[in-house]
Amino acid sequence: MINRLNRLCKKNILNNILNNNKNVSNRIINRFYCNLNTTNLKINNDNNLKESIREKIKDIPSLNEFLRNSNNEINENNENKSKIETEEEYELPPYLSSLPNDKGNGRKVWIETYGCQMNVSDEEVICSIMKSSGYTISNDFNTADIVFLNTCSIRENAEAKIWLRLTELRAIRRKQGRPNLIVGVLGCMAERLKEKLLESDMKVDIVVGPDAYRSLPSLLATLEDGEQQTAINVILSADETYADIKPVRKSDNQVSAYVSIMRGCNNMCSYCIVPFTRGRERSRPIDSILREVKDLSDQGFKEITLLGQNVNSFNYYEESNNNNNENFIDTQKNKLELESLKPREGFKTIYKSPKKGITFTKLMELVSKVDPEIRIRFTSPHPKDFPDDLLELIKNQPNICKQLHIPAQSGSSKVLESMRRGYTRESYIELIDTIKRVLPGCAISSDFISGFCGESDQDHNETISLMEYVGYENAFMFMYSLREKTHAHRQLKDDVPTTLKNSRLTQVVDTFYKRLKEKNQLEIGNHHLVLVDGFSKRSEKDFVGRTDTNKKVLISNDIENQDIKVGEYYIVEIIKGDSEVTLKGKPIMKSSIQHFNNIYNHKNKFI
């Protein structure tokens, strides 16, 4: 059975996915993985354990196979159909069998999330899955029966934190008398280091990749029933978006929320591990996105951030099966025409162009109309996917924030080519200039990597000059960390010494904060619409909120401001801007997005 499933996985499944047999294909893949778990990864204390793990994990279809087969134009539909029909006669193994909602029996789950906003969103999905199976999400680590580490693999330091935490958990099990504590590693690190995690002496009980969270209750059931001591599911799905799962929101104040609109990435930048840990791009059904936004609006949320690894390459092209006529969504959607997703002029891709579909610009238009009083942000985009019509939409829709993340990574065309970013310094600057012309005062943020393979002093200086030219409002700056499996790991040489990487990173950080402080000084006297989202972490004497441009503003919680409430919009005058991080503001009046837009109309004191 295993050999037959193995052959199917490696030769036929991905072609079937292309021929609209996704559900059948995924069931067969899942059978392969789950039989791999239940039959071949039972953990015994014998000397053959590590070899057994290696032998079985190497049979898992690789991402290269995934990509290669997904671009295959040969139609093998008839040949594959008979094979799949034969395999359909087999019943699903217990690993994927549906569980009753009370299977968790109230056992307490503690989740620690590391890394990006997508991981935060994934945690909310995991919470929903666990609660629906009868588990309780715990707010107290000390009472938890199960601990999940929701991990990041983007840099070596991110993984080092997890190894340290696993060491701590191993000690807690031993020294605090909690030998039955179940420890699971979820997310990108689980996908990337599945073999190492299972072979280590950290006593990891469960390893689950980003596309396999639905199987968590089943995996736990096999552990709790004593069927095996370790369970793994690290399948990369061609269509999993968790669209039907209602996230359990983790926000305490119910002001802002994340909405995941797509998963995976096709860009294959030479330094990046994301395509190997999260798979290929797939867009979530548009109706489900708009319903979630409407639900958040009904709950009183005031700000939504649309999420994706490459969010503005959203391209939904499947027909909707939803025949519900009671909502605004279907009526609007049916008016949309499918469009080709093409990179901006001066930018290029290394992958095959997708089918015509509903693009990110059209999605943003629909989302912005669900509730004109909800702010809309999005992250993380790619510079190639900023067409002019998207910029015009942002300009004309008051509730789409005038704050764009435009990851540069480097200011050197030579380094950008080595990174396989698909653009030059000149084309990036052209995009920035266009944004500044179409959206005056728009805040721009970015990502930068210092010390990439082959980076010279001149390359580094070009990055510094780009930062000085643009004047970023926020930046995520890191030293290059070589990741296995990436193009850089296979083809390039990590030849910049660590000390030089550090010194260059220091200069990058210093340049950013110098320009930011200059820009903050220019804010004094400007009026912004600030959404108050809580109190300052340093002192409850100050409210804290954010402008449309995502600048943090402190407002004194004094006698004059007793009417200020969390979750409301206020017009605020900036009175102090000497901090590198926050501004100080004085509230003028309570307002709304539409009211503020009518008063200022993006002119006068508003940036």
Swiss-Prot record:
Record key words, sorted: 4Fe-4S, Iron, Iron-sulfur, Metal-binding, S-adenosyl-L-methionine
Cofactor needs: [4Fe-4S] cluster
Gene Ontology CC terms: cytosol; mitochondrion
Keyword Magnesium: no
Domain of life: Eukaryota
Transmembrane spans: none
Residue sites binding [4Fe-4S] cluster 2 per the record: 265, 269, 272
Start and end residues of each TRAM domain: 521-589
Protein name as annotated: CDK5RAP1-like protein
Source organism of the structure: Dictyostelium discoideum
Gene: cdk5rap1
